[in-house]
A protein has these predicted regions:
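Cofactor-binding loop segments of dinucleotide-utilizing enzymes, especially the Rossmann-like FAD-
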Residues: 12-13, 39-42, 129, 177, ...
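Active-site and donor-binding regions of nucleotide-sugar-utilizing enzymes
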Residues: 6, 10-13, 17-28, 68-171
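Conserved nucleotide-sugar phosphate-binding/catalytic loop shared by glycosyltransferases and other
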Residues: 34-78, 88
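A nucleotide-sugar donor-handling region in carbohydrate enzymes
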Residues: 43-46, 148-228
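Glycine-rich, highly charged phosphate/nucleotide-binding loops
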Residues: 61-62, 75-91, 194-205
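A generic structural motif
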Residues: 30-36, 243-246
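Donor-nucleotide binding loops and adjacent catalytic segments primarily
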Residues: 55, 191-284
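Structural beta-sheet core signal
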Residues: 9-11, 37-39, 126, 174, ...
Length: 284
């Protein structure tokens, strides 16, 4: 079919992919839509799980890759990464000429997506606006809301909050979180049960995950990023003392991530906790 509408989805971090995987499939399979998939930010980096490998294994064709993350894991690096993202994504959108751009949640990379699209008069769709999380992420989420034209929110409370920000109620739609589709699929299909250690590897102890276990992911607090290492060491000590099998995931790329990562490595090397398995990514 000619004149398909081009929908550009920008994935900038590992959690964003699983959150919208079923939406990507729906766009890809729709006869009147063309999926333009842009992978950017930490989704391209091995130290943060290299999510692009899982995306391509799932059969998605990547339209563009945008390398935009600066080293440093501090507030200045976050600001510069955002600026670089605006520059690079502006070129991507200029060349692809999408009919709409989809951005997700509250990462600082997402505000770069929103700015680059909005200033080129490309309709912007924002997923999961209106949520309250605190920190800089909440400010970015609400800024994305004000730049967006269509809002796909995950709850009635979020919908009400977006409308109170002044957005047209006709364009605020409670779709729920699309990642629930993945949870339902796993629940409905026993064949999707797998050994996560065998599939994703990781380092640390061979924990017994077939009974009760914990899942831990601790990100740095960007307003207190200097304390990231101390914070994560406290959590690690507490989890080790619980002696419950635990999957521990690597932090994101926010300011303080270097301290969090350093704390994880040093604790693992010094104590080798018998109940913790450390993983970079877990993607269905």
């Amino acid at each position: 079919m000619k004149n398909k509408r081009k929908i550009c989805v920008v994935i900038t971090a590992r959690p964003s992919y699983s959150r919208v995987k079923t939406a990507l499939l729906a766009i890809k399979n729709h006869p009147q839509l063309e999926l333009q998939l842009v992978i950017a930010g930490s989704a391209l980096l091995g130290r943060y799980g290299n999510a692009i490998e899982f995306i391509e294994k799932d059969g998605f064709e990547v339209t563009e890759k945008v390398y935009m993350v600066l080293e440093g894991e501090n507030r200045t690096a976050m600001a510069k990464t955002t600026g670089l993202g605006v520059i690079e994504l502006a070129n991507v959108f200029y060349n692809l000429k999408p009919d709409a751009v989809i951005t997700i949640a509250d990462r600082f990379e997402t505000i770069a997506t929103s700015i680059a699209a909005t200033y080129q008069n490309i309709p912007l769709v924002h997923i999961q606006g209106g949520e309250v999380t605190g920190n800089i992420d909440e400010k970015v989420r609400h800024a994305n809301t004000k730049l967006a034209d269509i809002h796909l929110v995950a709850s009635e409370n979020a919908k009400e909050r977006v409308i109170k920000l002044g957005e047209n109620p006709d364009f605020v739609i409670n779709t729920g979180c699309p990642s629930i589709d993945i949870a339902k699929e796993v629940n409905d299909k026993p064949e999707l049960n797998f050994d996560p250690i065998k599939k994703y590897g990781g380092v640390g102890s061979e924990i017994n995950w077939k009974n009760e276990y914990l899942v831990v992911m601790q990100h740095p607090v960007t307003t207190e990023y200097e304390e990231a290492k101390e914070d994560v060491l406290k959590t690690l000590k507490a989890i080790a003392e619980l002696n419950i099998p635990t999957f521990w995931f690597w932090p994101n790329v926010d300011a303080g991530a270097d301290g969090t990562s350093s704390g994880i490595r040093s604790f693992r090397e010094l104590h080798n906790p018998k109940n913790i398995r450390f993983l970079k990514i877990w993607s269905h």
